[in-house]
Amino acid sequence: MNHSPQSARPVSIMRRFLDSEAAGGITLMAAAALALIVANSPFAQTYFDALHLYIGPLSLAHWINDALMAIFFLLVGLEIKREMLDGQLASWPNRMLPGIAAAGGVILPAIIFAVLNHDNPAKLRGWAVPSATDIAFALGVLSLLGSRAPSSLKVFLATLAILDDLAAVVIIAIFYTAEISMPYLGAAFITAAVLFVMNRMDVVKLLPYLISAVILWFFVFNSGVHATVAGVVAALMIPLKPAPGRPDDMTSPLHKLEHALAKPVAFIVVPIFGFANAGISFKGLEASVLGDTLTLGILLGLFLGKQFGVFGAAWLAIKTGLAEKPMGASWVQLYGVAILCGIGFTMSIFIGLLSFPSDLMQTETKIGVLSGSALSAICGYLLLRAARPDQSAANPLWKADESPEAKNFGRFLCVFHFASYIASTYCTERLQAASSLLRRSSLEFALPGLLKRLIPRRFRAVETEIPVVRLHGAIMTGGTSLRPTLSLASTAGILEKAFADKHAPAVAISINSPGGAPVQSRLIYRRIRDLAAEHQKKVFVFVEDVAASGGYMIALAGDEIIADPSSIVGSIGVVSASFGFPELLKKIGVERRVYTAGSNKVTLDPFQPEKAEDIERLKALQLEIHATFIDMVKERRAGKLGDNPDLFSGLFWTGTTAASLGLIDGLGDMLSFLRKTYGDKVKLKLIQPQRGLLGRKLPGIGMDSGSVEPAQIAAHLGDGLLCVAEEKAIWARYGL
């Protein structure tokens, strides 16, 4: 049969595409783009329903992520073994530069993510998500540059990505393992041992290895270890002959299998994974998702953490003589490849699915991965396209080069980082309105620290961070996690932590207390004033519902007191309350025997009739305490108090009246007042009691919930009933 040139041409084009280095990356990009389109089209429900369709014991999504991806990891394992024994990683000099760079590219993104999510254990599980590099995507982008990228850079990127994949496999095996089933795990070890014995006995036929690999996958899947690990273990057991072999050598079992899997994995397995997991529906998705620390942690980890980690580690290794720069590659090109390492699509999404069970967190993960990968791909490609080969002009940061090219590159680097900083800060400010009052925007606190050596000081955003301490509750000793109260013991720690902030010009204290023990009130007041003098900081007090009696005594520690117009303020007096049961014991047939050495030892005994002299003695004590309280008010509010005769009578007023009486300095709320004082860039940092890794603080200030035992709970319940009643009575005096 004769074939016309027209009929032969399409086949030739297809073959050239499949054989090209960029084909795998382009196919994966197309699959991801198609998934996004379908997920936001009229076919979205069909798409998501299909992924949750059960085929046997697993849904389609689980078959893809647990079974199909095991084939991907099998190929990864084969590549790792071949490179370690017969490739670029066969010698230590060749391993040093990509190995050190890969370590930096794993560690720094994880640190950035952990810094942004350290206060949320659920989100912190995803620390490894931004640590991976997608070899297909990255090499695909690099291949689009053609001859502009020297072959040494391609080898460096491929080797680094393989080591990155090895690190990801180890991370998955160690940190993302569910409950272990020892019988299945034991069976998996036995199967792996069989594979090892076959390798040592020089079994070269692939069929026994493949059958054993399927059995190994079954046991690993049921053991609790993620099933994809089975693919890597099986790959490491498939023999590679000691003699060096070419990539297309069909004599070695490893080369045979790698050659057979390369195209199916690149054009079937990975695109299916991308299509199944990149579909994000933007319907009903709030803008706040973009500003969530989970999304930002992944985005910044991939885009900034990868480039700084890889390039910084590589630069350090080269400058210290541990490794050599890739032949023919300039520093600019090496930096461009470091940016490309932030493309973490396949492995990053895969680790994200293992980290987070909830749909919302998985969506935030995918948004972070897609955004970070896209930024890395675009910026890396543009920089590499504009870069020149190894010349002194491309090395302005490390050589005294005054050429115009060197200066232009230096300007580009500064403008690039400055633009990244401004854009990130702007986006965060836009999203701040959607955040709660005291929620910190982690991006705005973390990013200046990362870039402060690159951005001139005069260009940095000026922000003021104010520590906030919440003092809420009745004032008395003996508080527990079940009945939190205010005392010097329970507040000293957070007060010291707040005042220890060297960069804060002031400390804000939020008070909501009806009062209580006068001694504890004065001790807390005194501690605040001592810390303010020691650290030379202003103290601003903000009254919420009530600052009465002892609560107002603590409020006097503020240089300025601000309240809401409806807040309750005042009650400058002293009250004592107790219960009397003089006839109770007789009625229930109980005789109480009391023996004293001192005539006044039974003063105000609740089981004896009240005596007039005892009442007079108590009132004398109250007058002394009241006088001390009045002196404190006059000292702290000197020149501000009005002439109202009821000022020290124990009456209390609304915030509006209290302002006219001089008991407070003004009306308003915390954020508005601090913005007016320190500018719109002010940030509030809530100071909380320290939390353990396993214990969680119950509301208020008290013991860790992890340390509360049933016996303690029972004791606290019995001991606290009357105290709770008394505390409720204190709040009730102010209608609360």
UniProtKB/Swiss-Prot annotation:
Record-level GO cellular component terms: plasma membrane
Principal cellular location given in the protein's record: membrane
Region annotation Na(+)/H(+) antiporter NhaA: where it falls in the sequence: 1-387
Recorded catalytic activity of this chain's protein: Na(+)(in) + 2 H(+)(out) = Na(+)(out) + 2 H(+)(in)
Segments of this protein annotated with the region Peptidase S49: 388-736
Residues passing through the membrane, by range: 23-43, 58-78, 96-116, 126-146, 155-175, 178-198, 201-221, 265-285, 298-318, 334-354, 367-387
Signal sequence segment: none
CDD domains named in the record: S49_Sppa_N_C
Keywords recorded for this protein, A-Z: Antiport, Cell inner membrane, Cell membrane, Ion transport, Membrane, Sodium, Sodium transport, Transmembrane, Transmembrane helix, Transport
Localization annotation: Cell inner membrane
Coiled-coil residue spans: none
Name of one Pfam family that matches: Peptidase_S49
Gene Ontology BP term (one): regulation of pH
Taxonomic superkingdom: Bacteria
InterPro entries xrefs: ClpP/crotonase-like_dom_sf (IPR029045), Na/H_antiporter_dom_sf (IPR023171), NhaA (IPR004670), Peptidase_S49 (IPR002142), S49_SppA_C (IPR047272)
One example GO MF annotation: peptidase activity
Membrane association type: Multi-pass membrane protein
Similarity comment: In the N-terminal section; belongs to the NhaA Na(+)/H(+) (TC 2.A.33) antiporter family.
Protein function: Na(+)/H(+) antiporter that extrudes sodium in exchange for external protons.
HAMAP family for this protein: NhaA
Name recorded for this polypeptide: Na(+)/H(+) antiporter NhaA
Species lineage: Bacteria, Pseudomonadati, Pseudomonadota, Alphaproteobacteria, Hyphomicrobiales
Gene: nhaA
